[in-house]
Design a protein with these regions (language model features):
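N-terminal helix-loop segment corresponding to the beta1-alpha1 unit
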Residues: 1-164, 170
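Single conserved hydrophobic/aromatic residue that forms the stacking wall/gate
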Residues: 175-195
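Extracytoplasmic/periplasmic beta-strand context in beta-sandwich domains
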Residues: 21, 169-171, 184, 188
Length: 195
């Protein structure tokens, strides 16, 4: 999304590549999902299990205007790459963290997958009701898209704020919350009907 707005995005991938590179459907040996999600991005492979990889990632962060990471909350902290490491040395940095279930609470360390979050937030049931009782999972990653829109909006607001104040900031979003907010009218209806 940010590349569409003119950002120069460097995507960091593990040595084996982003797992969505290997998904279907494919056209000319390329995953259509990967291409759609990563069009316009430059890529670099970094082995974050090695100290040299972590330091390379730290140098990339120090040179960035905006960082977006989507690990579980404990991962960047464990690697020493969380916002607190860079807040003082990079005061203009905008650091966005995306997680499945937030930075605290009983589900914070759970991995989030769009089909699971679809079911947890009621989208699967709602779509099944509309389809006359066919509750097959929707193949579209609603949660990924909704969370990307929410995160991009937060980053744009933070960039605007930085222009006014000169200060960067930490922003975060959660896939579960983003997806739930996308259909609050359904949630409200269910609560009012007490289903």
């Amino acid at each position: 999304m940010l590349t569409d707005l003119g950002a120069d995005v460097i995507k960091v991938e593990p040595p084996a590549g982003d797992m969505t590179r290997f998904t279907y459907p494919r056209v000319n040996s390329q995953s259509t999902y990967f291409v759609q999600q990563n069009v316009g991005k430059r890529n670099i492979s970094i082995d974050m299990d090695k100290p040299a990889g972590v330091e390379l990632a730290a140098r990339l962060i120090e040179s960035a205007d905006v960082v977006v990471e989507n690990f579980r909350p404990d991962v960047m902290r464990r690697l020493g790459l969380d916002y607190s490491r860079f807040a003082e040395t990079c005061p203009r940095l905008i650091y966005a963290s995306i997680s499945g279930y937030g930075a605290s609470g009983p589900w914070t360390s759970r991995r989030a997958y769009a089909p699971v979050v679809n079911a947890e937030t009621g989208i699967t049931k709602h779509q099944g009701d509309v389809r006359g009782g066919s509750y097959a999972n929707d193949p579209h990653s609603h949660g990924d898209v909704y969370t990307a829109v929410e995160t991009a909006s937060a980053i744009l607001a933070a960039l605007y704020q930085r222009e006014r104040t000169g200060k960067g900031q930490y922003v975060r979003s959660e896939e579960h919350t983003s997806e739930l907010q996308s259909h609050l009218n359904l949630v409200c209806r269910l609560l009012l009907e007490k289903k």
